[in-house]
Amino acid sequence: MNKVVVGLSGGVDSSVAAAVLHHQGYEVIGLTLWLMKGKGQCCSEGMVDAAFICEQLGIPHHIVDSRDVFQANIVNYLVSGYEAGITPLPCSQCNRAVKFGPMLNYARQELGCDRIATGHYARIRYDEISQRYQLLRAIDRNKDQSYFLYDLSQEMLAGTVFPLGDQTKEDTRRIAAEFDLKTASKPESQDLCLIEAHGSMKTFLDQYIHQKEGDIVDLEGKVLGKHQGIHHYTIGQRKGLGVAAPEPLYVVKLDPIMNQVIVANRANAGRSDCTVTRLNWVSIAAPSTPIRVETQIRYRSSAVPVDLIPLEDNRVKLVFDEPEFGITPGQAAVFYDGEILLGGGIIEL
C-alpha cells in the first residue's frame, strides 16, 4: 500500500486532501506543525480540528513542535525585514524552510515515508525532456497558490503531492460535505497566519519593533506629515497616511536610515524595472541569455510581460513594458510561461 504523510492545518483544504487520498486507498498519516508561541490561538484551534479529522478518517496523527524553527525563520525574518524598510514575503520562506523541507525529513526519518501531501492549490508534473519537476498553476486560477511555492527545491517537488490542484474550491467544499468532514463549512483562513493570530501585522510588529516617529516627505523632500514607525507602511500604500493633499498619495519608498516614508502621486509611483535576487529556478535551468516571461509581483496581482535579463550573483533584471505600480522590495517576483512556473526570487530596487 502506498503511504503518504498529509500536512494538516485544521482547514478544509488539507482535510479534503487527506480524505481524498485515504479514499483512494493510500495509507495516510496526518502531520500537524505547531508553529506559533504565545498568542497563536489559530494554531491551537487548528491542531484540535486536525486531530478530529484524523479520528474521523481513522488515521494516525502526529504533531511536531516547530515553534523554534518558525521563530527563527519567519518571525525574526519578518522583524528584521520591516526594520530595514522592506516588506518580506513570509509564506514562501515558510513553505521551504518550515513546512515542506522539515515535513519531508520527518516523514522519511520518523515514519518511513518518502512522500508528503498538502492542501495547496497547485500542480506538479515531471518533464522528461528537461528531467525536471515542473510546478504549474492550479486549475482554479482564483485559488492558485503556486506563487507561494516558487522556492521549493526539486527534491521537495519530487516528494510532494497536491491532490487539490485539479479541482476548484467549490469542488473541495462539496467533497468535504460528502465526507461529512467537520471542517466542511469552516471559514476561509487568512493568507498570513500571523495576522489571524494577532489581528493585524501592525499589532504583531509592534511587539518587536520600537515605534520611532519620523517624517512623511514627498519626492522633493518636503515634509508633509509624521509617522510612528516605517514598519507600519508598505510600498503602494494609500490609506492611513494621515496626510492632506490635493490628490491621492502613495508610499513609493521607505528609508530606514533617514527614518522617512516617501510618498508620491500615482503618476510618479510606477517603476520601469527592478532587480530580483535569491533566485530559485524550478521548471527550467537558470537562463544565460535574456528571455521573455510573465511576472507576478504580488499574490493577488496579474502576471505582466517583462524582459528578464540575467545578471551575476544569482540575480536578474526585469524590464517592464509599462511602468508597474507597487513593486515592493522583499516581496517575490515569480516568473511564468503560461501555466508553468519557471522560477522566482526576492525583489530589490
Curated annotation (Swiss-Prot):
Record Gene3D superfamilies: Adenine nucleotide alpha hydrolases-like domains, HUPs, Translation factors
Active-site residue numbers: C94, C193
BP GO terms, sorted: tRNA wobble position uridine thiolation
Alphabetized UniProt keyword annotations: ATP-binding, Cytoplasm, Disulfide bond, Nucleotide-binding, RNA-binding, Transferase, tRNA processing, tRNA-binding
Ranges annotated as spanning the membrane: none
EC number: 2.8.1.13
Disulphide-bonded residues: C94-C193
InterPro entries xref list: MnmA-like, MnmA-like_C, MnmA-like_central, MnmA-like_central_sf, Rossmann-like_a/b/a_fold
Segments of this protein annotated with the region Interaction with tRNA: 143-145, 298-299
Residues the record lists as binding ATP: G7, L8, S9, G10, G11, V12, D13, S14, L33, G119
GO (cellular component) term, any one: cytoplasm
Role played: Catalyzes the 2-thiolation of uridine at the wobble position (U34) of tRNA, leading to the formation of s(2)U34.
Similarity comment text for this entry: Belongs to the MnmA/TRMU family.
Protein name: tRNA-specific 2-thiouridylase MnmA
Organism: Rippkaea orientalis (strain PCC 8801 / RF-1) (Cyanothece sp. (strain PCC 8801))
Gene giving rise to this polypeptide: mnmA
